[in-house]
Amino acid sequence: MKKITLLKMQGCPYCAQAFAAIKEVKAEYREFADMEVEIIDKKNDERAKDFEGKYYYVPSMFIDGEKVYEAHPGETYGECLLNVKKVFRAAI
């Protein structure tokens, strides 16, 4: 299984949406239930430096360091959910 990393920012409504989508995907699909997501706060975590220049918006999700999903302003929960599913499928 590949490593999933999520970059977030405290107070970001799209990040909250992504966390809800992750919870929903893990509950709905048994094969994703035990998958772990490394969470990195872009402002308060030194590990965020490893991702500089690879994204603009948060949340952004990476598989083994490669960006697979980046939210955009105005993104709906449905869009987020589809993208989170895509990330989890790609990480298997």
For each feature predicted by the language model, list its residue ranges:
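Short, glycine/charged-enriched secondary-structure capping and boundary segments
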Residues: 19-22, 52-55, 76-77
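Local sequence-structure signature of Cys/Sec-based thiol-disulfide redox active-site neighborhoods
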Residues: 1-28
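Non-catalytic, surface beta->alpha helical segment in thiol-disulfide oxidoreductase systems
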Residues: 63-92
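Structural micro-motif
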Residues: 51-63
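Short, flexible, glycine/charge-rich loop motifs used to bind or transfer phosphoryl groups or to couple energy/partner
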Residues: 28, 50-51
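A general structural signal for alpha-helical elements within enzymatic catalytic domains
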Residues: 27-30, 89
